Amino acid sequence: MRRTLTLIVASLLMLVDTVNAENDVNIGKSNIKLESRMMTPEALWAMGRIGTVEASPDGKQVVYQVGYYSVKQNKGHQVICIMDADGKNRRQLTTSSKSETDPTWLDAQTIAFITGGEIWTMKADGSERKQLSKTDGEVEGFKFSPDRQKVIIIKSMPFHEIIKKNPDDLPKATGRRVTDLMYRHWDHYVESIQHPFLAKLEMRNEKLEISSNLIDILEGEPYECPMEPFGGIEQLAWSPDSKTIAYTCRKKTGAQYAISTDSDIYLYNIGTRETKNLCKPEGYQAPEVDASHTLADQKVNATGAHVGYDQNPQFSPDGKYIAWQSMARDGYEADLNRLCIYTMADGSMKFVDWKSDVESFCWAPAKDKQAVLYFLSVWHGCCNMYSMNWKGEVKQLTETWDDWTGLQLANDGKRILATRQSLSTPTDIYMVTPAVKKQPTKIEQISFENKHILDQLTFGKMQQYWVPTTDGKKELVWVMLPANYEEGKKYPTLLFCEGGPQSPVSQFWSYRWNFQMMAANGYVVVAPNRHGLPGFGQEWKEQISGDWTGQCINDYLSAIDFAADSLPFVDRNHLGAVGASFGGFSVYFLAGHHNKRFKAFIAHDGAFNLESMYTDTEEVFFSNWEYDDAYWNKNRTARADKTYENSPHKFVDKWDTPILCIHGEKDYRIVYNQGMGAFNAARLRGIPAELLIFPDENHWVLKPQNGILWQRTFFDFLNKWLK
């Protein structure tokens, strides 16, 4: 369930736009005037959300995408904005009520974008809008070749290999005949898959158009590219000479897809239409595997081949190398995300020697003597920026309490265009000049998307502590003070339980799990970086697999006990525990093991019954790796026994505290029967409980009115039991 920060941010913007694809009214930037200085759900949803960002070829301008939302209309609107590279002269280019997304520069004066499922262009001032593609509204992503003679177009095609097509004489039949696993993914049934298509840019009647003659790069192959559920155009790359395309693909279907994370990087030669796998030796055949047992100790992970996730390729500026993110082991989605560098001349590979996951990266200019690559990585609760030279030496460029969430060259060869957020600030755009010799890194904020709202708010202050753990180590714990904090007073306190289970408690800005919203409601937030989280070494992260109810639970209790015992502003008699996904699982488990510490629990989309979860979830590789075995295996491992024996549903007899269970019915990762089961069990035991269930939401809550209902229910419940 763990995903990188960049993918999560990009996918959320994409999914929200999909939910709100049809817009009747032009929804624009909010001029909300707040009645108090405390954050409200309405203020949160009034904020603009920055998405795609790109510098012009001459480095003089920046085009970017922003999402605005209307609570009344219950939908969003994606618009395109432009500004000078120093942040001046910001203006919105979108004037239509239709969303406009994925802006990119065709040349220094022309911007290409998607609207209505087609590729359009406009001048940098928003004029001369022209439609380039004619695909019946099917474009879902695109990328121009460096020579601007060709374009990759992402579009979906029908897929009936697993869910069979219903007979033509039964057009109103709603049943689905399923023949294998992966019949649904994340929040949808898999009845279509994305493929990349190649097209030429042609001049017709003195007008630039995209040829309707599309070449399917994966013609005849039943595989998706980009990869579901979060992959985008970043999973494909052009070579500098525009003759080759590198793409990401997991060439598996059905049960084999469901149990494996083995994706590869492929090279597609446009002239010959031949494809080469860069990650496997020629003739490689994957060993047979036991689909109901972890792949950790199976032959597939002893082959020496690249058998984990390999994705997001980028060619070096001179075309001599390709870099991509690479995981070593099949079946382990939270493996160390390494940066692999492939040499085109001889096929050799090397990996950047780094202690944590590479979240995203970009190549430095070809003539740069200080760096070869720039990348982002989480370390000690912050996602900062780093550079690497040809010697493999890594240098930290930023050292702020923030999460840098995206980076690319600013096209002047000297600066990096990046996005950044924190627990106290939503995403904005920055220009970063990397440190050179004695000159420190220079950081300049160039967008101020939500300044007019932030200036009206009072935020809680953040503190950092290193708390001893029961295994003799220390965990980093973020503590957020209430926005109305007064020295000498005590405040109700929330233990935040992170999901993943290998997602970082870093400086993320969330439009649901927003710490400043909790602070505005008068709560202290205690957020521990327990065992299992990245940014503290691979041993710390990997400890959690097979031990969901052991050390990480002790870490939660160590953090909240430290807060109650050592922080004078924490009211130990009014403690709550909240969390989503694995955090929701943690809440369900704590409900039976907290020894009267807590007065309220909230679990969002959490796993309650692990035996049910094993066969309910769609990405079986996750359950296999984390549990070791299917529950029916007679010779299952001791770790598997421990996992199933400690499933939260087996300790309901010890529940004694009010609980709110939240779930989305379109959540196919942790199916909604988990939340309903927990709620039903609590009520059958006579425990005060509430269930908030969304028929139209997935693992997240994406619609504005549902988001506000979520916030109101969350705080109504906490206020009832903790104040």
Where are these predicted regions, by residue range?
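Cap/lid segment of the alpha/beta-hydrolase catalytic domain
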Residues: 441, 448-573, 580, 615
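Conserved beta-propeller blade repeats
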Residues: 47-62, 97-114, 129, 136-151, ...
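A short helix->beta-strand "capping" segment at the edge of beta-propeller domains
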Residues: 28-48, 210-222
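Active-site-proximal cap/loop segments of hydrolase catalytic domains
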Residues: 514, 519, 527-723
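Beta-strand-rich domains and repeat architectures in extracellular enzymes and scaffolds
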Residues: 42-78
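Short glycine/acidic-enriched loop and turn motifs that connect beta-strands
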Residues: 68-72, 158-161, 252-255, 328-331, ...
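Short loop/turn segments that connect beta-strands within beta-propeller blades
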Residues: 84-88, 123-127, 202-204, 269-273, ...
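Predominantly five- to eight-bladed beta-propeller fold
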Residues: 24-28, 77-78, 153-220, 248-251, ...
